[in-house]
C-alpha cells in the first residue's frame, strides 16, 4: 500500500443512506449487495464524466465525493455529480441525505483513507438533517461567497432546515431545491417520494413529508 498523503482544500459531498441499519437486520445480504452495487454503479457513472475533477470513497452506508484539487473549476463538477447522484438514488427508491462542505482534507493509502476538517464538517451536517435533503454547509457557502458565486443560481434555497439535534438554523446553510429552472410539469421526483413515504416505517414518514413539501414549495412551473 502506498502511504503517500496528499493534503489540500477540497469540496466534499457526503451522502448517508437512510434505513440501512434496519435493512441489515431484516434483509438477506445478497439483496443488500445488489442494492449497493447499483448505487456504486450510479456513483461511478457520474464521476467518470469528470475524471480530472472528482473522485470518491465509500464505506458501509456512506458515499463520499471529493474534488481532486482546490481549484474553482472543481466545484461545478462536484455539484453536478452530487445532485445527479442523489436524484438517481431517489428515482430508484433509495432514501439518502447529503451535505457539501469545503476545507482541508488529506487523502492517502492508495486513496483508501481520508481525514480532515472538511470531512468532519460534511459528516456532521449530513447526519443532522431530518429529511431527504442535500445542503451546503457554512464552509461551502462561505467559500462560494469568496468566489462570488451565488448558490441560489444553482438551485439552492436559503430556508430553515429540519435538524435532528441542532436548536437553531445557521443562516449560511442552503438546501438544494431539486429545481434547475422553470418547468411546465411537476417535479418527477414527487411521485417516487410519495411511494417511498407510504412504504416507510411510521416513525420515518415525516422525513418524506418534509421533503415533498419543500420541493412543492420551490418547484417553478411556467
Where on the chain are the PLM-derived regions?
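Catalytic/regulatory signature loops of cyclic-dinucleotide turnover enzymes
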Residues: 91, 97, 119-140
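Residues immediately flanking
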Residues: 17, 102, 138
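A short glycine-enriched loop-to-beta-strand structural element that forms part of the catalytic core
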Residues: 61-62, 66, 94-108
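Intrinsically disordered, glycine/charged-rich C-terminal tails and inter-domain linkers
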Residues: 2, 131-132, 136-222
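Catalytic NTP-binding/metal-coordinating core of nucleotidyl cyclase/transferase enzymes
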Residues: 1-91
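Short, hydrophobic/aromatic alpha-helical segments in well-folded domains
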Residues: 81-85, 101, 121
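Catalytic-core segments of nucleotide cyclases and related cyclic-nucleotide turnover enzymes
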Residues: 79, 107-126
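Residues that scaffold the ATP/ADP-binding catalytic core of kinase and kinase-like folds
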Residues: 23, 108, 144
Amino acid at each position: 500500500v502506498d502511504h503517500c498523503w496528499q493534503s489540500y482544500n477540497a469540496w466534499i459531498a457526503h451522502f448517508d443512506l437512510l434505513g440501512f441499519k434496519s435493512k441489515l437486520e431484516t434483509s438477506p445480504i445478497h439483496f443488500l449487495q445488489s442494492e449497493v452495487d447499483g448505487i456504486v454503479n450510479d456513483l461511478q457513472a457520474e464521476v467518470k464524466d469528470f475524471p480530472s475533477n472528482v473522485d470518491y470513497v465509500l464505506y458501509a452506508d456512506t458515499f463520499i465525493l471529493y474534488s481532486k484539487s482546490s481549484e474553482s473549476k472543481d466545484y461545478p463538477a462536484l455539484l453536478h455529480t452530487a445532485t445527479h447522484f442523489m436524484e438517481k438514488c431517489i428515482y430508484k427508491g433509495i432514501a439518502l441525505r447529503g451535505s457539501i462542505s469545503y476545507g482541508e482534507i488529506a487523502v492517502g493509502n492508495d486513496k483508501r483513507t481520508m481525514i480532515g476538517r472538511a470531512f468532519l464538517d460534511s459528516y456532521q451536517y449530513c447526519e443532522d438533517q431530518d429529511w431527504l435533503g442535500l445542503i451546503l454547509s457554512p464552509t461551502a457557502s462561505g467559500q462560494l461567497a469568496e468566489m462570488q458565486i451565488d448558490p441560489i443560481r444553482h438551485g439552492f434555497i436559503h430556508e430553515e432546515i429540519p435538524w435532528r439535534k441542532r436548536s437553531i438554523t445557521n443562516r449560511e446553510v442552503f438546501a438544494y431545491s431539486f429545481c434547475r429552472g422553470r418547468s411546465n410539469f411537476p417535479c418527477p421526483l414527487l411521485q417516487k417520494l410519495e411511494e417511498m413515504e407510504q412504504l416507510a416505517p411510521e416513525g420515518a414518514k415525516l422525513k418524506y413529508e418534509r421533503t415533498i413539501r419543500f420541493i412543492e414549495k420551490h418547484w417553478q412551473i411556467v
